[in-house]
C-alpha cells in the first residue's frame, strides 16, 4: 500500500481549496449555477473561515456582501460586464490578468505581449506535472487563473520551499501591481476585492511557506 504524501496535510488541503476558489473566480464570469454554489451554506462557511484572518476579513466581507446582493438577472449581467471590461477587453480601462504583462520590462498595458516567456514557462511546468490548460479556456498559460490552479494542485504534492519559490516568482512578484490596477479600474466592488484578497492571501502564504 502506498503511504500518503507528507504534503497531504489538512492545512495544505485547505490552502489548495483557497487557491482553487480564487482561480475559479478569475476564470470566467459568475453565472446562475456558480452563484448558487457561492451562496450555499458550505461556501459561506468557508468564506467565514477565511475572514477569521483579520488581514483577509475586509475583502472577504465585501465579496460576501456582493454575492448576497446578486439576486436577479440584471445584477449578474452587471457583474459580468465588470469582468469583461476588466479582463477580456484590452485598453486603458482593463486590468489584463497575465503575469507576463507585469514581469517583462517592455510590458504594454494597452497591447500586452501574449504567449511570451511566462506563458512558455508555465506551459512547460504544466506539461511536467501532466497538467494543461483546458480546451474551453482559450487563454495564455500565464493567466492568473491558470497559475492559481497550478498552485492549488501543487499545494499537496510539493514541499513548502519549492512552493514558496514558485509562488514568489509567478504570483507574489506582480499581484500588488495587478490588484492596484483592478482597484483603479473596477466600476463595482467585487473584482477589486477579489484582486486585493488574492494579493494579500498570496503574500501571507508565501511568507508562511518561507518561514
UniProtKB/Swiss-Prot annotation:
Primary subcellular site in the record, as a coarse category: cytoplasm
Superkingdom per UniProt: Bacteria
Localization: Cytoplasm
InterPro entries recorded: Chaperone_TorD, DMSO/NO3_reduct_chaperone, HscB_C_sf, TorD-like_sf, TorD/DmsD_chaperones
Keywords noted in UniProt: Chaperone, Cytoplasm
Entry-linked SUPFAM superfamilies: TorD-like
Keyword Cytoplasm assigned: yes
Entries under Pfam families matching the protein: Nitrate_red_del (PF02613)
UniProt cross-references to PANTHER family, sorted A to Z: CHAPERONE PROTEIN TORD (PTHR34227:SF11), CHAPERONE PROTEIN YCDY (PTHR34227)
Stated family: Belongs to the TorD/DmsD family. TorD subfamily.
Protein name: Chaperone protein TorD
Species whose genome carries this gene: Shewanella loihica (strain ATCC BAA-1088 / PV-4)
Gene label: torD
